[in-house]
């Protein structure tokens, strides 16, 4: 199943509609002098749910960034979803980032696992293992295993994933969404070469995280 990708993410349509109706009603009843703050809220909701198309690098061994945000970890770690040692790269998304998730590589999904959990600040390391999360494990045609984990944050309370085990994914394909601040962890084979560093701002699909 392909993730729907209009300019404004479908997940945001109900929130945008509610914010627009409230702003219009208050504007009609009380005037712009009071309603302006609700118009600002509408603008914020629209920008939060934006979901623009992105250029996709064609480099064969590139692992693309699955989300917009800032790099908060580049380290060797255990991948509990594929049971291996791996290179872990983590992306933290604040409320101003685009919140759709996109596949980092071409491949077939071998596993999708959802885990209920806490709602700690997604920027801290223990969010990777304690927060609500959803992991997909992707097997590439070359035999590499890539794990992408959606992690809920302090404000985010709903992870959406639109793919299932056995389905194919193409690099840059939208496969999920997390509402209101979150994190994505990517686990790669040991020996992969990172192309990003901690603190760096990254963009979904257009930024290369690493080379396999």
From Swiss-Prot:
NCBIfam families: AS_decarb, PRK05305.1-2, PRK05305.1-5, PRK05305.2-5. It is found in: Cell membrane. Its EC number is 4.1.1.65. The keyword Membrane applies. One of its GO terms (biological process) is phosphatidylethanolamine biosynthetic process. Its cofactor is pyruvate. One of its GO terms (molecular function) is phosphatidylserine decarboxylase activity. The active site is at residue 182. Keywords: Cell membrane, Decarboxylase, Lipid biosynthesis, Lipid metabolism, Lyase, Membrane, Phospholipid biosynthesis, Phospholipid metabolism, Pyruvate, Zymogen. It is a peripheral membrane protein. Pathway: Phospholipid metabolism; phosphatidylethanolamine biosynthesis; phosphatidylethanolamine from CDP-diacylglycerol: step 2/2. This is Phosphatidylserine decarboxylase proenzyme. It comes from the Bacteria. It comes from Paraburkholderia phymatum (strain DSM 17167 / CIP 108236 / LMG 21445 / STM815) (Burkholderia phymatum). It holds the Pfam family PS_Dcarbxylase. The record marks 181-182 as: Cleavage (non-hydrolytic). Is synthesized initially as an inactive proenzyme. Formation of the active enzyme involves a self-maturation process in which the active site pyruvoyl group is generated from an internal serine residue via an autocatalytic post-translational modification. Two non-identical subunits are generated from the proenzyme in this reaction, and the pyruvate is formed at the N-terminus of the alpha chain, which is derived from the carboxyl end of the proenzyme. GO terms for cellular component: plasma membrane. Heterodimer of a large membrane-associated beta subunit and a small pyruvoyl-containing alpha subunit. The modification Pyruvic acid (Ser) is found at residue 182. It catalyses: a 1,2-diacyl-sn-glycero-3-phospho-L-serine + H(+) = a 1,2-diacyl-sn-glycero-3-phosphoethanolamine + CO2. Binds 1 pyruvoyl group covalently per subunit.
